[in-house]
Protein backbone atom coordinates (compact mmCIF):
# COMPACT_ATOMS: atom_id res chain seq x y z
CA UNK A 1 0.00 0.00 0.00
CA UNK A 2 1.24 3.47 -0.82
CA UNK A 3 1.54 5.81 2.17
CA UNK A 4 2.35 8.99 0.24
CA UNK A 5 1.30 10.42 -3.10
CA UNK A 6 4.91 11.22 -3.89
CA UNK A 7 5.89 7.56 -3.49
CA UNK A 8 3.07 6.44 -5.76
CA UNK A 9 3.77 9.12 -8.36
CA UNK A 10 7.44 8.13 -8.56
CA UNK A 11 6.43 4.49 -9.04
CA UNK A 12 3.71 5.39 -11.54
CA UNK A 13 6.12 7.52 -13.58
CA UNK A 14 8.41 4.53 -14.15
CA UNK A 15 5.60 2.04 -14.73
CA UNK A 16 3.63 4.35 -17.03
CA UNK A 17 6.76 5.07 -19.08
CA UNK A 18 7.33 1.32 -19.43
CA UNK A 19 3.74 0.76 -20.51
CA UNK A 20 3.97 3.66 -22.96
CA UNK A 21 7.10 2.11 -24.53
CA UNK A 22 5.19 -1.12 -25.14
CA UNK A 23 2.15 0.62 -26.56
CA UNK A 24 4.32 2.79 -28.80
CA UNK A 25 5.82 -0.41 -30.26
CA UNK A 26 2.48 -1.82 -31.41
CA UNK A 27 1.34 -1.74 -35.03
CA UNK A 28 -2.19 -1.80 -36.38
CA UNK A 29 -1.60 -5.32 -37.71
CA UNK A 30 -0.20 -6.57 -34.39
CA UNK A 31 -3.42 -5.64 -32.57
CA UNK A 32 -5.01 -8.76 -34.11
CA UNK A 33 -2.42 -11.13 -32.58
CA UNK A 34 -4.06 -13.80 -30.44
CA UNK A 35 -3.06 -16.92 -28.56
CA UNK A 36 -6.38 -18.60 -29.30
CA UNK A 37 -9.75 -17.42 -30.52
CA UNK A 38 -10.98 -17.84 -26.94
CA UNK A 39 -8.52 -15.31 -25.50
CA UNK A 40 -8.10 -11.58 -25.80
CA UNK A 41 -6.09 -10.22 -28.71
CA UNK A 42 -3.07 -8.00 -28.21
CA UNK A 43 -5.24 -5.02 -29.14
CA UNK A 44 -7.90 -5.99 -26.60
CA UNK A 45 -5.31 -6.27 -23.82
CA UNK A 46 -3.68 -2.99 -24.85
CA UNK A 47 -6.99 -1.11 -24.89
CA UNK A 48 -8.03 -2.69 -21.59
CA UNK A 49 -4.78 -1.40 -20.10
CA UNK A 50 -5.68 2.11 -21.25
CA UNK A 51 -9.26 1.99 -19.99
CA UNK A 52 -8.31 0.31 -16.71
CA UNK A 53 -6.88 3.57 -15.37
CA UNK A 54 -10.36 5.07 -15.30
CA UNK A 55 -12.24 1.85 -14.62
CA UNK A 56 -10.18 0.85 -11.56
CA UNK A 57 -10.35 4.35 -10.06
CA UNK A 58 -14.04 4.87 -10.85
CA UNK A 59 -15.18 4.16 -7.26
CA UNK A 60 -12.93 6.89 -5.92
CA UNK A 61 -13.70 10.60 -5.88
CA UNK A 62 -11.08 11.31 -8.57
CA UNK A 63 -12.38 13.03 -11.69
CA UNK A 64 -10.35 13.03 -14.90
CA UNK A 65 -10.76 12.27 -18.59
CA UNK A 66 -10.03 8.68 -19.57
CA UNK A 67 -11.81 6.01 -21.60
CA UNK A 68 -14.60 4.50 -19.50
CA UNK A 69 -15.13 1.37 -21.61
CA UNK A 70 -12.59 -1.18 -22.78
CA UNK A 71 -14.74 -2.46 -25.64
CA UNK A 72 -14.95 -2.10 -28.60
CA UNK A 73 -11.23 -2.14 -29.33
CA UNK A 74 -9.82 0.62 -31.54
CA UNK A 75 -8.08 -0.55 -34.72
CA UNK A 76 -5.33 2.09 -34.54
CA UNK A 77 -2.24 1.31 -32.48
CA UNK A 78 -1.35 5.00 -32.49
CA UNK A 79 -4.77 5.88 -31.07
CA UNK A 80 -4.29 3.34 -28.26
CA UNK A 81 -0.81 4.69 -27.43
CA UNK A 82 -2.01 8.30 -27.54
CA UNK A 83 -5.04 7.47 -25.39
CA UNK A 84 -2.83 5.87 -22.75
CA UNK A 85 -0.60 8.94 -22.68
CA UNK A 86 -3.62 11.22 -22.25
CA UNK A 87 -5.30 9.04 -19.60
CA UNK A 88 -2.11 8.59 -17.59
CA UNK A 89 -1.34 12.31 -17.62
CA UNK A 90 -4.91 13.22 -16.65
CA UNK A 91 -4.80 10.65 -13.83
CA UNK A 92 -1.54 12.07 -12.47
CA UNK A 93 -2.90 15.63 -12.60
CA UNK A 94 -6.07 14.51 -10.79
CA UNK A 95 -4.03 12.88 -8.04
CA UNK A 96 -1.85 15.95 -7.61
CA UNK A 97 -4.80 18.34 -7.40
CA UNK A 98 -7.58 16.26 -5.80
CA UNK A 99 -5.86 13.96 -3.30
CA UNK A 100 -3.50 14.30 -0.36
CA UNK A 101 -1.46 11.73 1.52
CA UNK A 102 -4.41 11.45 3.91
CA UNK A 103 -6.71 10.41 1.02
CA UNK A 104 -4.60 7.27 0.57
CA UNK A 105 -5.89 6.02 3.95
CA UNK A 106 -9.56 6.47 3.03
CA UNK A 107 -11.35 3.21 2.34
CA UNK A 108 -13.45 2.44 -0.73
CA UNK A 109 -15.35 -0.55 -2.03
CA UNK A 110 -13.51 -2.25 -4.89
CA UNK A 111 -14.81 -5.48 -6.42
CA UNK A 112 -16.75 -6.32 -3.27
CA UNK A 113 -14.02 -5.59 -0.76
CA UNK A 114 -13.09 -2.60 1.33
CA UNK A 115 -9.59 -1.25 0.78
CA UNK A 116 -7.65 1.95 1.30
CA UNK A 117 -7.04 4.13 -1.74
CA UNK A 118 -3.30 3.50 -1.28
CA UNK A 119 -3.92 -0.22 -1.82
CA UNK A 120 -6.08 0.50 -4.85
CA UNK A 121 -3.18 2.42 -6.40
CA UNK A 122 -0.90 -0.57 -5.78
CA UNK A 123 -3.50 -2.81 -7.41
CA UNK A 124 -3.61 -0.48 -10.43
CA UNK A 125 0.14 -0.80 -10.94
CA UNK A 126 0.09 -4.58 -10.45
CA UNK A 127 -2.86 -4.94 -12.82
CA UNK A 128 -1.05 -2.91 -15.47
CA UNK A 129 2.13 -4.98 -15.02
CA UNK A 130 0.15 -8.20 -15.36
CA UNK A 131 -1.22 -7.10 -18.72
CA UNK A 132 2.17 -5.78 -19.86
CA UNK A 133 3.53 -9.28 -19.40
CA UNK A 134 0.75 -10.70 -21.54
CA UNK A 135 1.39 -8.08 -24.20
CA UNK A 136 5.10 -8.86 -24.44
CA UNK A 137 4.40 -12.50 -25.29
CA UNK A 138 1.87 -11.55 -27.96
CA UNK A 139 4.22 -8.88 -29.30
CA UNK A 140 6.95 -11.50 -29.78
CA UNK A 141 4.46 -13.79 -31.51
CA UNK A 142 3.51 -10.88 -33.78
CA UNK A 143 7.16 -10.40 -34.73
CA UNK A 144 7.59 -7.09 -32.90
CA UNK A 145 10.68 -6.04 -30.99
CA UNK A 146 9.85 -5.83 -27.30
CA UNK A 147 11.46 -2.95 -25.39
CA UNK A 148 13.20 -3.73 -22.12
CA UNK A 149 11.36 -2.79 -18.97
CA UNK A 150 13.14 -4.09 -15.85
CA UNK A 151 16.28 -4.91 -17.79
CA UNK A 152 17.41 -5.22 -21.38
CA UNK A 153 15.26 -7.08 -23.87
CA UNK A 154 16.96 -9.68 -26.05
CA UNK A 155 17.68 -7.11 -28.75
CA UNK A 156 19.07 -4.51 -26.33
CA UNK A 157 22.04 -6.31 -24.77
CA UNK A 158 24.39 -5.17 -27.54
CA UNK A 159 23.76 -1.53 -26.55
CA UNK A 160 25.51 -2.36 -23.29
CA UNK A 161 28.38 -4.12 -25.03
CA UNK A 162 27.10 -7.48 -23.81
CA UNK A 163 25.95 -10.67 -25.45
CA UNK A 164 22.32 -11.63 -24.92
CA UNK A 165 21.83 -14.60 -22.56
CA UNK A 166 21.88 -17.99 -24.28
CA UNK A 167 18.60 -19.58 -25.22
UniProtKB/Swiss-Prot annotation:
SUPFAM superfamilies: DinB/YfiT-like putative metalloenzymes (SSF109854)
Entry protein name: Uncharacterized protein YrdA
Superkingdom to which the source organism belongs: Bacteria
Listed Pfam families: DinB
Keyword Transmembrane helix on entry: no
GO molecular function terms noted in the UniProt entry: metal ion binding
Cysteines paired by S-S bonds: none
Gene source species: Bacillus subtilis (strain 168)
Family in the record: Belongs to the DinB family.
Alphabetical keyword list: Metal-binding
Amino acid sequence: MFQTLDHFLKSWEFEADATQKLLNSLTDESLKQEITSQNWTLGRIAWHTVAAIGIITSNTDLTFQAPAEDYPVPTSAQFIADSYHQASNAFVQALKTQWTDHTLQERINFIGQQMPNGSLLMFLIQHQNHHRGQMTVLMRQAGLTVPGIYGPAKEEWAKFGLEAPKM
